[in-house]
Amino acid sequence: MTASSNLADLLEQVSVDRMAVTVAALASDPLAGRRVGSTGGAAARDWLVNRFTAPGADVRTEEFPVRAVPQVYEAPTVTWGEGGRTDELVFGRQVAIHPASADTPNIRRGALAVAGKDDPTGRWLVVPADMSLFDAYRDTNRAAGLLVRRPVDAEGWQFTMLAGPDPGPLPVLTLDPDTHHAVLTAATAGDGWLAGATPLRRDDVTGANIHACLRQPAPAGADLLLTAHYDGVGDHPGLRLPGASDNATGVAVVLEAARVLATALPAGAGLSVALLDGEEVGALGSAHHASQLHAAGAAPMVLNVDGVGRLERAAAVEAGGPAHRLLALLDQAGRHTGIPLVAGPVASDNRRYGGAGFAAVGIGAGMGGYHSPADTPDKVDPATLAAIARLVVATAHLAATAPATLSSSIGDKR
């Protein structure tokens, strides 16, 4: 049997249904968005550990500390008005809490003013769109708080971020563009008021990576590491943030690729999986793992998958470390499977591995509803899951067998 026909058989084994089950499970209500250190994150971890069923698989978890994870512990009540009109803002759509906000559980009411122009005392300062939060803080003496503009997705949701600057001394609320414009207009006219709170605490928690060694590498054999983060930003009170595309899809692809490859790679090729925690708070899980690999003298080739919910034109690929050979193999795999690739940012765990000196490539293929309630399983395209899983299988197969060329069913011209 030729390498080409053997790979064709492997690609046929990729199961979309199996991946869809993984996405649905990780995005389900009981897992509550899978924030690092949460009960939902622990439930996701338990579920994932049980997915490794290959004979002889060595599966373990590795804990690491995570400091100051922001968590909205109560839906904020925010109202504003001008003249005789009063509007209560909808949490998650019109208003949200900035990750750099102080924890202010009690409602503060104050007149509106423009940051950097008006007397800040006792007022909510509206930060113009072209002003940074750093600049807005220059003149905030005894201000009630800050109001900053934040874009929304196609369904009108604001996105949630866990990683960001340290908290400042003031409550900071984010407003959707329309509300921000209306509030800024009122403040410029010397009119209007706002009343709101920012119930946002920061918890020190424990994250945990999941490691599975499916095949030990021979001394001169290829050593492949497939990675994806399983944590999400977590639900808010009254708001579900399922994290289907980000990153239940990446986990589903890695699990499926590992299942197909576990018994199919040639003797001497190593295969491991790392399902990583803490990506949403600064890729801390991969930083922890990369330091362990470096200390152990390991040299795996890393394929990281993050956000593969909907392939539009081409899959984004970002390389780090000594990844020239891995990139060449990925390009060859893309040509063979018919998946167009383009160099583009994949701001994920691959950067931690690349920064630690390992050959690392991140793969992304689009998503809907980034860090919002709109990131649901029904928005995940099954064909995209299949395409990226086949790309990973083909790349790993080529890395293990290392043929000079591989005939493509669609030809090598683009």
Predicted segments, located by residue:
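Noncatalytic luminal/extracellular "stalk/propeptide" segments of secretory-pathway proteins
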Residues: 10, 21, 29-124
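N-terminal capping segment at the start of a domain
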Residues: 3-39, 55, 60-63, 154-169, ...
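Active-site-adjacent substrate-binding region
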Residues: 165, 310-414
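Second-shell loop/turn segments in exported
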Residues: 5-13, 30-39, 54, 102, ...
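Soluble metallo-hydrolase cores and metallopeptidase-like ectodomains found primarily
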Residues: 98-112, 159-243, 259, 263, ...
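Extracellular/luminal Protease-associated
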Residues: 15, 85-171, 337-338
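Acidic/histidine-rich catalytic neighborhood of metal-dependent amide-processing enzymes
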Residues: 206-209, 232-326
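Extracytoplasmic/secreted proteins, especially bacterial periplasmic and envelope-associated proteins
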Residues: 18-21, 25, 43, 47-50, ...
